[in-house]
Amino acid sequence: MTEVVAVPVRLRPSATAGVRLPELVAQVGAVLADGPGQAATVPDIPVTGVTLRAQEVLSGDLFAALAGASTHGARYAGVALERGAVAVLTDVAGVAELTAQASSVPILIHPEPRSVLGGLAAAAYGHPSNRMTVVGITGTSGKTTTTYMVEAGLRAGGRVVGLVGTIGIRIDGADIPSFLTTPEAPALQAMLAAMVERGVETVVMEVSSHALSLGRVEGTQFAVAGFTNLSRDHLDFHPDMEEYFEAKAVLFDPHSLLRARTVVVCIDDDAGRATAARAGDAITVSALGQPASWRATDIRSPGVGAQEFTAVDPAGVQHRVGIRLPGRYNVANCLVALAILDVVGVSPEQASLGFRDIRIPGRLERIDCGQDFLALVDYAHKPGALHSVLTALLQPDHRLAVVFGAGGERDPGKRAPMGEIAAELADLVVVTDDNPRGEDPAAIRRDILTGTVAAGGAAQVVEIGDRRAAIQYAVAWAGPDDVVLVAGKGHETGQRGAAETCPFDDRVELARALQVRDARLLPAPGRACQ
């Protein structure tokens, strides 16, 4: 069983030499605020940490007071000072929010303080990414799977590994829960420093477009970056697909300060080919027969949920590889992982040993309660991912059911396409709720159903808002050798409504439905989140 460790207030090193405040000020071009109590010059004091959460300040920290969605962080400067902050970094608007108490420490002003946080934190923690090998994985889908594969290969090769991603943080196999794909810049640098302290040699992390756009990985030196694919997602954050692509491209662009020393790119879509062309010297991979540095041939599936293929490396040497994941897209993810592992000195043979028993929470995760059909949970929550996973699960003479919804307060333009994809590929489509947040769940379902109507076809389409009841319906429908997929939430353990997040785990609910299925004693639907 995987070890679960206690979560500290914030994962950070037990000790750090820190950096002098004048050095930090000079590094980022901040200016000292005028006003009562402020010195004429920046005082020569040590800064041993950086945080933007007042409640997490430790003595010696610089507190970054940033503008938030509803309030300015400067309002909490008093809390930060009480906890031992030695300086405050903010913007002009933040200065106006500061109380008189804040005049007891240096107040630094920068027009865009968030943009310099990564560099400040990296300096305060001794530039931890320079003391280890950091691998970054980006792309719309496959980031989590690829990072887990790289981690598994590294551990099989005897390395001490850190992992940072959507599911959580891992240090040498021990799990630490997380809530962001990529943590905020100060937390990330503190985390990397703590990993150095614990003997981690290589860190593999998911790098989201949000993280790249918001500067969360500034101050990080990437040894290797991997690109999986690009399809529609996050258009509630990015104005269009072009900006979404550009956000991810900075890890590969030779003119970018964040560009990794070595880059690995899957060229099985247009975005991958454009990324490789921009990089100029990318190690390329293809699972679709494209000319590439690493290629997959002789792909075979001994059964639903497993594949074997031959990976042909840049020297033309063939390596037989097996993975317990279906779909050509997972062959592509595996090739990206193999190429990255080769760069950092892990052979395909060593990597394959790590892949053999890999289990990725909520990524085509099997739920087996002795039933005579296949039941799976997956994180697919966007059109491209849903298409890929449903295509991977299609088998002659086996019916396919999918239960899914779409998140509220997120890109509404992907709802109808997801409905159309589901109705085109599955035999049973159960449209349900998935983190409606502040939106009307029924309206979200209507958007999805518009797509199922557009698909036409013979799929049976059912609308059941209560997610528990929707899962139970699909389980009751399934017969021998059928496939039931519950998509969208994957590893998540809550259903987000407008006012609360209710405990809800698709894996638990699917197992529960399977356990009572034979007795036909399906319980009444539970309370929906409000």
Curated annotation (Swiss-Prot):
Residues involved in UDP-N-acetyl-alpha-D-muramoyl-L-alanyl-D-glutamate binding: L52, T181, T182, S208, R216
Residues annotated as signal peptide: none
Location(s), subcellular: Cytoplasm
Annotated motif Meso-diaminopimelate recognition motif, positions: 434-437
Main localization (coarse): cytoplasm
Post-translational modification: Carboxylation is probably crucial for Mg(2+) binding and, consequently, for the gamma-phosphate positioning of ATP.
Pathway assigned in UniProt: Cell wall biogenesis; peptidoglycan biosynthesis
One annotated GO biological process: peptidoglycan biosynthetic process
CC cofactor: Mg(2+)
Sites where the protein binds ATP: G139, T140, S141, G142, K143, T144, T145
GO molecular function, one term: ATP binding
Protein name in UniProt: UDP-N-acetylmuramoyl-L-alanyl-D-glutamate--2,6-diaminopimelate ligase
